[in-house]
Amino acid sequence: MLIPRRVKHRKQHHPKRRGQAKGGTQVSFGEYGIQALTPAYVTNRQIEAARIAMTRHIKRGGKVWINIYPDRPLTKKPAETRMGSGKGSPEWWIANVHPGRVMFELSYPNEKIAREALTRAAHKLPMKCRIVKREAGEA
């Protein structure tokens, strides 16, 4: 699971889910990528599930890049607890993903298998996604 080793503050404010992605909107490492179309919080478990779905489908010969990292804690109070008594304890680690962000990238020689692997990974994520291909002029 992806979690930070140490953080300066254990509890943070909830991040905003408005606006477009400021960077990371183009495929820069692999040939194909998964791009977010709606905003969402992606947990470390969802990132891991998508990674496993991709790598199991392509088996060997490909390379996967993960471009998001769950660096924000989300807190939760226990069930049947009265209001007050401070903020709850950290439960999940999330990555705040804005529309347009390329979250995963994949390099694989066969386009059909690569697209199927990315589709399987996109089904594990909590937002609408699309598969994008690297353009000829991109970095």
Swiss-Prot record:
Which stretches does the entry tag as region Disordered?
1-25
Cross-referenced SUPFAM superfamilies: Ribosomal protein L16p/L10e
Q: Which UniProt keywords apply?
A: Ribonucleoprotein, Ribosomal protein, RNA-binding, rRNA-binding, tRNA-binding
- UniProt xrefs under Pfam families: Ribosomal_L16 (PF00252)
- Keyword RNA-binding present in the record's keywords: the answer is yes
**Which Gene Ontology terms cover its molecular function?**
rRNA binding; structural constituent of ribosome; tRNA binding
Out of the domains of life, which is the source? Bacteria
Give me the stretches of Basic residues compositional bias: 1-20
Q: Which Gene3D superfamilies match?
A: Ribosomal protein L10e/L16 (3.90.1170.10)
**What NCBIfam families does the record point to?**
rplP_bact (TIGR01164)
**UniProt family annotation:** Belongs to the universal ribosomal protein uL16 family.
Q: How does it assemble?
A: Part of the 50S ribosomal subunit.
UniProt name for this protein: Large ribosomal subunit protein uL16
User: From which organism does this entry originate?
Assistant: Streptomyces avermitilis (strain ATCC 31267 / DSM 46492 / JCM 5070 / NBRC 14893 / NCIMB 12804 / NRRL 8165 / MA-4680)
> Which gene holds the coding sequence for this protein?
rplP
